[in-house]
Amino acid sequence: MGYSVIVIDDDEDTVRLFSEFLEENKIHVIGQGYNGKMAVELYQKNRPDCVLIDIMMPNGSGFYAINKIKEINPHAKIIAVTGDGRFTTEQKLEKLQIPVIYKPFKMNEVIQKIQS
């Protein structure tokens, strides 16, 4: 069986395109959300193998969601997908041990991170 993921980004086009690409590559998208609060709700409901999440979003940032998801499951696999390359963001992600993919990204890089 393939991997299951939820895709979280405040840009609906990004979520749609990302999801289509993942499905084409046999990665099952079991949830889509547009803010940190939705990410937590989708994780609780679906328990995916992996969460792909943007960092800068309204109604609960990616960091909010990461912390809440880690409270639910400390071993949850989360990958940050962000255009925010500030050093402070990098430090926070490193401290949380969250791998990051910077926008613009290559989809092959995303597939590799999900499967690793």
Predicted regions and their residues:
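Active-site beta3 strand of CheY-like receiver
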Residues: N46-L52
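Active-site residues of response regulator receiver
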Residues: D9, D54
